[in-house]
Amino acid sequence: MDVHDLTRAPPEYLEVVWVTDVCKLVMAVGWLSNYIGMIAKSIKEQTYSMALMPLCCNFAWEFTYFFIYPYKVPMERNIHTLAFLLNCGVMYTAVRYGAREWGHAPLVQRNLPVIFVVCIACWVSAHVAFAEQYGPSLAQAVSGFACQILLSAGGTCQLLCRGHSRGASYKLWLARFMGSFALILPNMLRYKYWRDDHQYIGSPLYIWFLGMFLFLDGSYGFVLWYVRRHEREQVLVAKPKVQ
């Protein structure tokens, strides 16, 4: 799969393509740092960082565009290879420690590995169906946006439902946000200089995706601050008062 075939690119875009390459590297640093940080955080605190359903959707997306519709551009292929391998580590920690977070739901707790397998299989089938319907290039981009929205919403909901910040940190949030935010400028440049092949970037759906990403991921930072403030208050309440 060649997401952005530069042989089709107009000269105006080729003049600024270096900007998109720099942004891709920023994206890679952000997301790879996020994956490494999630693995380390999960092992240290014996939990998992990414919400269950977004994790399965994201892993399925990585799997689909690593094995079934692989990238042809060397830089993108190498970045995606590292991302997939690290995502395997994220998935391992989720399976290894996930049951600790589901004591309130014994059915889920006992069957978590099966739930992960079924969810990943379902999401892979969805990504493949979308790619076959609309073509891998467009499907890769649009389904990637959908993964991001699900991840942003799922992360915020996970914080609210758990009521604690184990598995979460400002560094993980900022790395993820930076990695995704870095792709906005390349999309703007493609829409401005290479519009024929990137009409979807100016569509109402893409604008909605962008707005929801900024709102949901921005909200995550506020919710994390609120949860941590509540944790500090609980610690103070639990401390015995000195007579």
Curated annotation (Swiss-Prot):
Biotechnology comment: Diterpenoid pyrones display various biological activities and subglutinol A shows insecticidal and anti-HIV activities.
EC number: 4.2.3.-
Keywords attached to this entry: Lyase, Membrane, Transmembrane, Transmembrane helix
One BP annotation, GO: terpenoid biosynthetic process
Predominant location category: membrane
InterPro entries tied to this protein: PaxB-like (IPR039020)
Pathway(s) this gene product operates in, as recorded in its UniProt entry: Secondary metabolite biosynthesis; terpenoid biosynthesis
Localization terms from the record: Membrane
Enzyme class: lyase
Membrane protein topology class: Multi-pass membrane protein
One GO molecular-function entry: lyase activity
Transmembrane segments: 16-36, 50-70, 79-99, 112-132, 141-161, 172-189, 207-227
Cellular component, GO annotation: membrane
Domain of life per record: Eukaryota
Family: Belongs to the paxB family.
Functional note: Terpene cyclase; part of the gene cluster that mediates the biosynthesis of the diterpenoid pyrones subglutinols A and B. The first step of the pathway is the synthesis of the alpha-pyrone moiety by the polyketide synthase dpasA via condensation of one acetyl-CoA starter unit with 3 malonyl-CoA units and 2 methylations. The alpha-pyrone is then combined with geranylgeranyl pyrophosphate (GGPP) formed by the GGPP synthase dpasD through the action of the prenyltransferase dpasC to yield a linear alpha-pyrone diterpenoid.
Listed name of the protein: Terpene cyclase dpasB
Gene encoding the protein: dpasB
